[in-house]
Every structure is written in structure tokens, then in C-alpha cells.
Amino acid sequence: MEAIKPEDLNNHIGAVRSTSWFTVTQEMINQFADVSDDHQFIHVDPEQATPIFGSTIAHGALMLSLSIGKGYETALVVEGTKMAMNYGYDQVRFINPVPVDSKCRFNSSLLEVNDKGGGRLLLKFNIELD
């Protein structure tokens, strides 16, 4: 992956970068339920979830977590960066359920570049599930 000079970041605003497609499996959902201690039936019990959603559905927090790991596929690497950190989330919404065995990918686009001084940059992205 080619590193981008900090002064060139504004040239990347609005460009959509997509991750590879992946499948949300019941095993992933079950493992996340175990780690998060969220065993709500809509996630882990197909018999109870199917009349409501047609199948079990992924946790919203699972999908948010996957956006981080999958996001490395499309990350903008800034030249000279020693460390990058997640600063937080704005306006996170879980608008539609993600049924088990869904094929998904994340689309991200750079919205803003803010120079915070002292060699620090704050990059704001929009990330959507496809």
C-alpha cells in the first residue's frame, strides 16, 4: 500500500474505497455473543428469530467491530505516521438487520482532514455497510 503525503490527503476526500466481500456466519455471531455476553435470541436462536427476521441476525456491535478490522484493507496510510488510533464514532446507526449468511462489505470515504498541530491529524470518514 502506497503512503500518502499529509499535504495530499485532501485529494482523497470523497473517494469511495470498498473492502472485500465477506459472509456473516452463524459461527461469527455465536462467537461475538460469547465475547460480548449478548445472547439475545434474535442473534443465537434460529427457531425463535426466524418468525421475526427470517433467520438470526448479526449484532450491530459485531458489524461495527468488523468495520474496524476490514477497514485495514482500505486504510489510507499517511506518510511518516508512527501510530494511528480510533478517536471515536459519530452518528452510529443500525438501520437494517444483517441476516445470517449475508454477503457484506464496507464502503468508506474520507470526509475531512483536520491538522491538529504537533504532527497530529484528525481524519473523519463515512463508513457504510453494503
Spans of features found by a protein language model:
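Catalytic strand-loop segment that frames the active site of acyl-thioester-processing enzymes
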Residues: 1-58
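HotDog/MaoC-like acyl-thioester-processing domains
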Residues: 1-12, 96-130
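Predominant activation on well-ordered alpha-helical scaffold segments within soluble catalytic domains
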Residues: 30-33, 64-68
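Hydrophobic beta-strand-centered segment that forms part of the acyl-chain substrate-binding groove
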Residues: 52-55, 68-107, 111
